[in-house]
């Protein structure tokens, strides 16, 4: 296949993030963001990287995703990278929820679109926007393969003992209630990159991946396959996050409805947008929380302590699930940049072979690196995630194969 470029689109409800990559060397040719779609002051920022060009910004009304992608196409064309280029092999789309139906990236057809739409009830904030992005791209280049890469796909290897909730089986099956997990594209990339850092093949490494951003999740990866993950039916379960509560007693919801006279919508907003770090101390930026701690702020300290306590519980649980752990990998905004979080998460875990070297932990960088002491039984690493490269890699691998039929398994 002579065409070697892949355009990666991450379509949100009011934004489109994009990158154009050349898969011959995985280099980025252009990156950009369209935000506040549907508003009078929409904003597009485009940076051509191939020619070392300067960023261009534009502000004005962008009515919908169709207008947004047309604006992106126009910016790319200015740099000789237009969507009509014969060098463009495919467009890869991030799709948040594929249920257990999609276990691999798949070329989009009518049946695939219908299945993504069928999953909207379990991903109401994300799948509609992802669908809009795909359909808009199809309209712009109907002859070009559109590939869906699912956040949930990496987690479909979990055993039923990890994926099932302990509720009535018929009810769970009827409403597709199970642990799906999210951030899978990041967990897949980081687990492989960690194995490479250790000089081993992915199938020979057991790793606990900690994706710590405003949204946060952990996964237990045995030999390159996910066996457990912290997020569940939705991204609300698991770790303490920027604005999400993570794990809690489900009866809190009933209590708030009965005693607090709150509606389901109000409780949903509380747990997803007004909880986690921001609910505990009013901030969801770890840098600001650390600054407040340094000034003696007790609420910030408590929020940090709760965050770390939950993180340690998952590290211990996944250590038990895996049996043997070769590495702990920190990734995403907080995981990559917040040395105090990494230090606190590993503190007191010497009996598990876990520790960080203070000097190595303080070093900042863009490359995967070890922060554990020399000779440590378990490697502790900082591994910057690259979800766009992972989507492009999976997309290119699929369209470069001879079999481009949609890849699905069974029905939910």
What are these regions (language model features)?
Residues 259-303:
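A mobile "lid/hinge" subdomain adjacent to the ATP/sugar-phosphate binding pocket shared
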């Amino acid at each position: 296949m002579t065409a070697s470029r892949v355009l990666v689109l991450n379509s949100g409800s009011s934004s489109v993030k994009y990158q154009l990559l050349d898969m011959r060397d995985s280099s980025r040719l252009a990156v950009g963001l369209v935000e506040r779609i549907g508003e009078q002051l929409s904003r597009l920022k485009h940076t051509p990287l191939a020619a070392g060009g300067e960023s261009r910004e534009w502000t004005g009304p962008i009515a919908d995703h169709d207008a947004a992608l047309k604006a992106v196409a126009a910016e790319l064309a200015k740099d000789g990278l237009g969507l009509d280029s014969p060098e463009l092999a495919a467009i890869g789309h991030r799709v948040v929820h594929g249920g257990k139906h999609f276990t691999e990236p798949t070329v989009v057809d009518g049946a695939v679109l219908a299945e993504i739409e069928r999953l909207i009830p379990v991903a109401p904030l994300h799948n509609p926007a992802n669908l809009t992005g795909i359909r808009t791209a199809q309209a712009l280049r109907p002859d070009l393969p559109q590939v869906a890469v699912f956040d949930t796909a990496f987690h479909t290897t979990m055993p039923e003992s990890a994926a099932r909730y302990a509720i009535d089986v018929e009810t769970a099956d009827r409403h597709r209630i199970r642990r799906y997990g999210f951030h899978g594209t990041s967990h897949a990339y980081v687990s492989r990159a960690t194995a490479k850092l250790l000089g081993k093949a992915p199938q020979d490494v057991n790793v606990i991946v900690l994706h710590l951003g405003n949204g946060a999740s952990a996964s237990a990866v045995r030999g390159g396959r996910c066996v457990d993950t912290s997020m569940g039916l939705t991204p609300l379960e698991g770790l303490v996050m920027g604005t999400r509560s993570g794990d809690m007693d489900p009866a809190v919801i009933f209590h708030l409805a009965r005693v607090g006279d709150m509606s389901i919508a109000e409780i949903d907003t509380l747990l997803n947008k007004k909880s986690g770090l921001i609910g505990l101390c009013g901030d969801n930026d770890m840098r600001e929380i650390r600054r407040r701690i340094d000034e003696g702020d007790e609420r910030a300290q408590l929020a940090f302590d709760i965050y770390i306590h939950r993180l340690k519980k998952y590290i211990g649980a996944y250590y038990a699930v895996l049996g043997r752990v070769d590495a702990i990998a920190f990734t995403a905004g907080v995981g990559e940049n917040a040395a105090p979080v990494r230090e606190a998460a590993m503190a007191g875990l010497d009996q598990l072979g876990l520790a960080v070297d203070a000097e190595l932990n303080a070093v900042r960088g863009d490359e995967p690196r070890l922060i554990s002491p020399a000779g440590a039984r378990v490697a502790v690493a900082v591994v910057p995630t690259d979800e766009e490269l992972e989507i492009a890699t999976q997309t290119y691998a699929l369209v470069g194969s001879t079999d481009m039929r949609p890849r699905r398994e069974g029905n939910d």
